[in-house]
């Protein structure tokens, strides 16, 4: 599986809303496999298709917290709960981090690689990773959400 080039801030694909996957083909599955390989090679915890130059609604996540690899097609957040602030970084924004307020718990709905709908209830770091990657599908980068001094009261 080839490792894909990770697009960096300034690339227009990172600021575009990704298109839904309408059919899961061999090409789709190959893209997912290559995204997984790229994420692990880059030592990331998540990757969205736009980060490798593909404007499709696909994410892969593995926070290393024991839940294993999660691959989602057309993911969407359907429920949120609570708020939390935490430092974030991004493979597409190298060398920069910042504190971001996000929901502490989320329920995410999407399709697995077999086309079956799945719902995942996540909290903590996994919930944050889902929100970060789904933001990528909407052309949003974490730096757009970094809190400024005085905004940290949640």
From Swiss-Prot:
Its cofactor is Fe(2+). The keyword tRNA-binding does not apply. This is Peptide deformylase. It comes from Halothermothrix orenii (strain H 168 / OCM 544 / DSM 9562). Coiled coil: none annotated. SUPFAM superfamilies: Peptide deformylase (SSF56420). NCBIfam families: pept_deformyl (TIGR00079), PRK00150.1-3 (NF001159). Its EC number is 3.5.1.88. Removes the formyl group from the N-terminal Met of newly synthesized proteins. Requires at least a dipeptide for an efficient rate of reaction. N-terminal L-methionine is a prerequisite for activity but the enzyme has broad specificity at other positions. It catalyses: N-terminal N-formyl-L-methionyl-[peptide] + H2O = N-terminal L-methionyl-[peptide] + formate. Keywords: Hydrolase, Iron, Metal-binding, Protein biosynthesis. Binds 1 Fe(2+) ion. Belongs to the polypeptide deformylase family. It is an enzyme of class 3 (hydrolase). GO terms for molecular function: metal ion binding; peptide deformylase activity. It comes from the Bacteria. The keyword Protein transport does not apply. Fe cation binds at residues 90, 132, 136. Signal peptide: none annotated. The active site is at residue 133. One of its GO terms (biological process) is co-translational protein modification. The gene is def.
């Amino acid at each position: 599986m080839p490792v894909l080039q990770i697009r960096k801030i300034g690339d227009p694909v990172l600021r575009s809303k990704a298109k839904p996957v309408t059919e899961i083909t061999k090409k789709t599955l190959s893209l997912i496999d290559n995204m997984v390989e790229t994420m692990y090679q880059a030592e990331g915890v998540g990757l969205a298709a736009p980060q490798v130059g593909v404007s499709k609604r696909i994410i892969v996540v593995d926070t290393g917290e024991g839940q294993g690899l999660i691959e989602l097609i057309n993911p969407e957040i359907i429920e949120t709960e609570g708020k939390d602030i935490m430092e974030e970084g991004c493979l597409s924004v190298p060398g920069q981090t910042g504190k971001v307020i996000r929901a502490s718990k989320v329920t995410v709905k999407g399709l697995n690689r077999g086309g079956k709908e799945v719902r995942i209830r996540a909290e903590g770091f996994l919930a944050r990773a889902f929100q970060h990657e789904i933001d990528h599908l909407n052309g949003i980068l974490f730096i757009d959400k970094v809190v400024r001094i005085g905004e940290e009261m949640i």
